[in-house]
Amino acid sequence: MEFSTKTEILQEQQAGAQLFVCTEEAQLNHPTALALLSSLEEGQNFADTKIPTGNGLQAVAVCCLKSTGRAALNKAAAEAAKWAQNQETVNVDVHAFEEAQAAAVAEAFAIAFGNAAYRFDRYKKEAKPAKFAEAVFHSAHEAAVKEALRVAEAQVYGQSLCRDLGNAAPNECTPEFLARTAKAEAEKLGAHAKIIEKDYIKENMGSFWSVAKGSVEDPYLVELSYFGAADKEAAPVVLVGKGITFDTGGISLKPGLNMDEMKFDMCGAATVISTFCAAVKLQLPINLIAVVATCENMPSGAANKPGDVVKSMKGLTIEVLNTDAEGRLILCDALTYAEQFKPKAVIDVATLTGACIVALGHDVSGVMGNNQDLVDSLLAASYNVDDKAWQLPLFETYKDQLKSNFADIPNIGTPGAGTITAATFLSYFTEGYPWAHLDIAGTAWKSGAEKGATGRPVPLLLNYLRNL
């Protein structure tokens, strides 16, 4: 998908499909668009038609915005994107808006167009590429719109990378594949990448290794780094991602129904890799590090057993009461590893608990943390781009649900508040820095007819990083 800008006002008979984005009060200098705007009934905000030209029929559409809030923008843009899929090139006129609004409209519509054009068909014999290939935005505020399109392009790139990684089959997207892809993508953008292999993990990260040793696939720890701040020594933001490339549940085996979707259990890692790369693509003036722990969770003679006690990198011992609560076992060591960077903030991202879906459904990510300013910044970013998230509490009393007779802590709590007790477990390993946890179990992918990775919460995290 290509985006570009022009300052000219669209006229009748001009080549290419035409989309006018405006308000109800807009004075459109285009008879067909004006007629479409006048035809909108109560509750409608989109109308389209085709008009004859010397080269055949031309598609013309109007999208009338009742609000320029991001949620309303995203909804309107998604509707327009469905129409745009049938065009090759769409000219989008946003002359009805002043500079800031024109930029916001262009960004939202470009992101919707880019995401709608996404295809994942590399395993199919006959691929069907998207017809829609180019969007040209027309505005008097060309510089502001051009910058908005630069941001949109980076977000679409990040979400598409995240979706590609999530959608990849688990026999292709092994821990090694995920690690090598992260390294290659980061280095292509000029960032530094380091892959840490099995021997280090086995020797230093006992909790992580306890999960990984059940699989024939080796585990990897990936470290990506980018120093874009004027002060290269300034404390970085560290993103930490859970990369379980397939989760059977281990000895505590999951039910067979829908187990194929457990290839998406690495979407936290995919989000972290993709957000990092999008931030580097934008050349944000920040110092940023991404840490990804990746392995499989498989049942075997070498796998964790319920009742096993393992020692974390921090030194705390963990009683494994359920081998299907493995994400926190690899994350806790990755979070301890992050301490060495003396971070400004650490944000971990994980498809951690089914309980989060019970609490918040499939449209809202859960946010928890030990620093309210950091949590508030993430919630603000969520609102800015309409990538919904909601804070859950982390009261000290939840630690009462994490008691073990045989180790320092168990890997699951007593029944109730499963999302919170999982985050409470992680909080034992994040005492040395400001930390927030994003549980994306409900938002990272869709099931059913639209099955596939969503690329969320890349929009939220990228907006957070842009506003540092």
UniProtKB/Swiss-Prot annotation:
GO terms for cellular component: cytoplasm. It comes from Neisseria meningitidis serogroup A / serotype 4A (strain DSM 15465 / Z2491). CDD domains: Peptidase_M17. Mn(2+) 2 binds at K242, D247, D265, E326. Belongs to the peptidase M17 family. It holds the Pfam family Peptidase_M17. Mn(2+) 1 binds at D247, D324, E326. Presumably involved in the processing and regular turnover of intracellular proteins. Catalyzes the removal of unsubstituted N-terminal amino acids from various peptides. The active site is at K254, R328. This is Probable cytosol aminopeptidase. Keywords: Aminopeptidase, Cytoplasm, Hydrolase, Manganese, Metal-binding, Protease. Coiled coil: none annotated. InterPro entries: Leucine_aapep/pepB (IPR011356), Macro_dom-like (IPR043472), Peptidase_M17_C (IPR000819), Peptidase_M17_leu_NH2_pept (IPR023042). Its EC number is 3.4.11.1, 3.4.11.10. Binds 2 manganese ions per subunit. SUPFAM superfamilies: Macro domain-like (SSF52949), Zn-dependent exopeptidases (SSF53187). It catalyses: Release of an N-terminal amino acid, Xaa-|-Yaa-, in which Xaa is preferably Leu, but may be other amino acids including Pro although not Arg or Lys, and Yaa may be Pro. Amino acid amides and methyl esters are also readily hydrolyzed, but rates on arylamides are exceedingly low; Release of an N-terminal amino acid, preferentially leucine, but not glutamic or aspartic acids. Its cofactor is Mn(2+). It is found in: Cytoplasm. GO terms for biological process: proteolysis. The gene is pepA. GO terms for molecular function: manganese ion binding; metalloaminopeptidase activity.
